Structure formats: structure tokens, C-alpha cells
Amino acid sequence: MSDDTEDDSGGESTADMEFGEQPAPLGVKVGSTRTVVAEDDADSPSVTQTLTCLATYDDALTGEEHVIYGAEAATEYPDRVRFMLRSGLPEDEETTGLAKRFFEEFASANGLDTDSVVVYAIPTIDNEAGLDRLAEIIEDGPVGERRIASYPESLCGAVPALGDGLDAIEDTFVAINMGSTNLEACAYRRGEQLAPFSTGAITGTEVDRRIANYVEEETQGRVNIDLTTAREYKEQHADFNDYEPFSDIIQQPGGGTYEFTIEDAVMDAVDEFVDAAVDEVANVFLPDLASDYVKIYQQALDNPIVLTGGMGCIPGIVSEFETRLGEEIDREVEATTADEPETAAARGAHRIAERLVDLGEY
């Protein structure tokens, strides 16, 4: 909406006359597990995140339907909370509507600026219908009156990993997005995607399922945990550098409690994830990249491989991936990730949004 037409009295653009001052830059990632928004100064952004879920309940006095979202919904209404983007994208009209309602509630509760330029970090998934539904959610959203743009999640996540500015937009490198619902790999050449690859077989959610199964096996069937608890075990205890067994207590059906200790379940699951991710990258993605863009393949592997997504938060996973991939392809490689990988995509999107505002591209 960049319009430089001036009037006779003030010299203000049509956009400024309509909206006022410069729009606020926002970076947004609406993920399958978490939604993250970065705003304010890109050098030190304010980051807000919540679980991508909602629940409804009827007011006990008026019968009016109310909506709650995020951790509050997951904790208070575990029986009917809806994670509407479990597969990474909305699957039908119902989940699209739920996602719209969730984002409206989230934006309102957190005071997100409607007079804004918004950059969304979106997944690289071969699902045109799902991407169209995601676009509908974005376009109908409560923010981004000046401009809405979208960039690949792995590119956005690489931005804070490769410098303080937007160096990632000028570099040639490989990014691996280790998300809840997909493992994505892509080469970037000055922001252009090359040989994008995605699989739903190697995911953070699959790690959660394995942890739940392995906990049951390790406790000889005495403990059954849900996927939310398995995810919490992973996030709180998985550590390639300094893992320590941990204990938990459950309430038994007949009364009383049972205390148990987990030795291997969590690390077995994340160890298998790294092996599977390395195998897919080394034996599927990289050969395809080399076949189509051999010079880009060579140049990209001379630069650090950027790991993004929630699984990148596990301490030591970057060096573990680096070592195993190097052994698999018989070549020295370097891997890196941003600080706080779980929010990196939103923070990178925010930097892009701020640059668009600075350039007047709205």
C-alpha cells in the first residue's frame, strides 16, 4: 500500500493520512504447537508466545459462550481443547474457523497493533489446499492493515542465526527446520528457495509419541502418559550434553501414588530422531540438491547449516547433528542455530517486517 501522492496542504502520503504514523512491524509464526509474535524494536524485540489451541465454555449465569486459549485452555479443558493446526496446516473449514478465532483472541488479549506490517513465517509443505486455508487465516486476521507478507519458516528462523541484520537474505546456505509436524530442508540463495524438501515422518510430535511408548515399556506398563506430558518431559529433560535421569509421580486409579524414574525413554527417542533426520538429509535432500544445483550444494556446505524449529532447543543437538551428518556424508560440516530456536522464526520475520517498514514497502 505504498502511495507517495501528496496533498496540497501537508505533504503527507495517502497511507499516512489514512493510518497516521509509520506502521508497527510484527513477525508472526502460527505453529502447530505454539504461536509466537515478535514486535517493537527488532534489536531487542518483545516476544509473546502461547500454545496454538483453544477451548470454549458456557457462562454458568448467562449461558454465553466464552473462548480461552493457550496453556489456560490446555490445562483447564484437556478433555475438549482443540489444537487446530496439529498437522501444521488447517485441514478443513472447521479448523480454519477455529484458527481464525484463536488468532483474534490472541491478538486482542495481547494488544497487537492493527496498523501494522506483518510478516508471517510459514511452513514449506507440499499441500496447496492447506496453504490456501492458511492464507485465508492470514488475510482475514486482525493485524496487518498496511501490508501482509509471508516468507518460509526456515528462512525466517535462519535470520537471527546468521547475524544481527538480514545477512541470511544475502547468503547461500542450507536450513533444516526440525518442527513439531514436519522435517523441512531447503537451500537458500539470496533468499530464493532451492530444492525444498519436507517429510511428516520425522517430527517433534513423533518424538513425543515414542517417549510415551518408551515410558510405558520402561515402567513395565505401569505408567501411561499423554502426548502433552511426553512433550514436557522432552522439553524439560532432553539433553545431549548432560542428561540426568528424573523422577515423577502419578496418581493411581485405585488411590495412592506411584513414583517412577525415567532412565532411557526420553534420550532414546530424541537420539532416534537425530539419526532419522541425518539419514533423510544426507541420503535424500542433499543428493537431490547436488543433482540439481551442484555448485550451490558445494557452496552451501562450505557455510554453516542452520537448524531451526523447536527440536533445535535440545541442548547439544546442534553438535550431535553436525557430527553425525559429517560422518554420514564423509565431509566436515558446521551446524548452528539461533539463540532460543523456538522463537527464532518470529524474530526473523520481525526483522524482515522492520526492513519493509524502513523501506516504505507498505
From Swiss-Prot:
Residues 1-28 are annotated as: Disordered. It comes from Halobacterium salinarum (strain ATCC 700922 / JCM 11081 / NRC-1). Its main location: cytoplasm. Disruption phenotype: In standard phosphate media, deletion of the gene does not affect the rod shape of the cell, growth rates or motility. In low-phosphate media, when the chromosomal copy number becomes limiting, cells lacking this gene show defects in cell shape, perturbed DNA distributions, reduced growth rate and reduced viability. Forms dynamically unstable filaments. Monomers are added at the growing filament end. In vitro, salactin polymerizes in the presence of ATP and AMP-PNP but not in the presence of ADP, GTP, ATPgammaS or buffer alone. InterPro entries: ATPase_NBD. It holds the Pfam family Salactin. It is found in: Cytoplasm. This is Salactin. One of its GO terms (cellular component) is cytoplasm. Actin homolog which might be involved in partitioning DNA between daughter cells when chromosomal copy number is low. SUPFAM superfamilies: Actin-like ATPase domain. Residues 1-10 have a biased composition (Acidic residues). The keyword Nuclease does not apply. Keywords: Cytoplasm.
